[in-house]
């Protein structure tokens, strides 16, 4: 359970509250490259869940190991058939962070922010693209959301053209 929630969250940048609504039947037949349309709870806007190879592998492994029923929530509570709550995911992520001695305040929203940070710093994805992905009103909102540091600005100013 832990791995699938991490892999889907870190690879899609969706809000955890939207991921928690997923049922096994929503994803069990999806292949890499396929998408599923979701409606964001916060904004009411449509967005997509992308199945990349890592997400597909995590889903496949989870389904083989846990053998959930198609009508169950993908992220089910251990106390019945209800979906996990955002509070439960927050607690889970805080436990993960503590287990590896991370001292900052991590929670459910960390997966969404980390997606953007990695896309920007490792893959060079621009704020315009990330703003579209996040359904933000502008790249400026995304820049504030991801937190541009003065060190990054100074580093940019040191680039010689």
Predicted segments, located by residue:
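Conserved catalytic core of the tyrosine transesterase superfamily
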Residues: 1-161
């Amino acid at each position: 359970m832990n791995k699938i929630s991490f892999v889907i969250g870190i690879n899609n940048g969706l809000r955890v509250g939207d991921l928690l609504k997923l049922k096994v039947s929503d994803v069990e037949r999806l292949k890499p490259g396929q998408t599923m349309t979701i409606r964001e709870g916060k904004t009411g806007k449509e967005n997509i869940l992308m199945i990349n190879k890592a997400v597909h592998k995590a889903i496949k492994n989870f389904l083989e190991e846990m053998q959930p029923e198609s009508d169950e929530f993908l992220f089910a509570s251990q106390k019945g058939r209800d979906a996990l709550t955002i509070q439960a995911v927050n607690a889970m992520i805080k436990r993960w962070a503590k287990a590896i001695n991370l001292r900052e305040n991590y929670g459910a929203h960390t997966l969404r922010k980390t997606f953007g940070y990695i896309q920007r710093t490792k893959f060079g994805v621009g704020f315009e693209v990330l703003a579209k992905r996040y359904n933000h009103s502008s790249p400026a909102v995304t820049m504030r959301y991801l937190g541009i540091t003065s060190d990054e600005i100074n580093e940019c100013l040191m680039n010689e053209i």
